[in-house]
Amino acid sequence: VLFRSKGAKVDHFTKFIVKTNSKWLKEVKASGNANFIANSPLKGDELKINANSNCLVQLKQKVEVGKLDLNVSGSANMVVNELKTDKLECSINGSGTINLKAGNAEEADYSITTDGEIMAFGVAVPEVNCKITGKGSAQIHPTDNLKATIVGKGNIRYKGPTAVQQKVIGKGTVEEV
């Protein structure tokens, strides 16, 4: 389902509610002041969610996919209550947040540009690559290996113990909690 209103002057807002019984969802693109809320579990091979501006994306039930790709730009926010995936990719460009409350993945790539925040202490991942450019922050839970790269004042806090390879250019920090 795609709703667009480019170039239209709107003096009031319409609320769209889309209900479906499908548990399979492949891609979501939310922009503007849109909210996307999934109240049911989601399964599939791959799920990609892009959110920008002031969007709120909430996945309230378990997401179980082969690859989960979460992208935030601007000041959008995402909340995933529970996930299970082989490959997790989280990217923030701006001041948005991604909050992953519980679950596990086999490997994860976390990337923050500017001052966004990834909160993922509840998601255990054996292999993690985390890169921050700017003053963003990440709270993550690598169980075997962490490759951490910071350019700027970013902060990576991780649950340990784990093997850590780190490269910091600037005043950023990588610390075990």
PLM feature segments, named:
Residues 163-177:
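Short, low-complexity, Pro/Ser/Thr/Gly-rich segments in the mature regions of secreted, periplasmic
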Residues 79, 92-99, 112-116, 132:
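Solenoidal tandem-repeat scaffolds enriched in leucines and small polar residues
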Residues 20-28, 40-49, 60-70, 80-90, ...:
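Short "repeat-start/strand-capping" segments in structured domains, especially the N-termini
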Residues 5-6:
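Solvent-exposed adhesion/ligand-recognition segments of exported proteins
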Residues 34, 55, 76-77, 96-97, ...:
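Serine/threonine-enriched low-complexity regions in disordered or flexible coil/loop segments
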Residues 30-33, 52-54, 58, 72, ...:
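Extracellular beta-strand-rich, repetitive "passenger/adhesive" scaffolds
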Residues 13-16:
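Leucine-rich repeat
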Residues 1-2:
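Short, small-residue-biased leader/transition segments that mark boundaries at the very start
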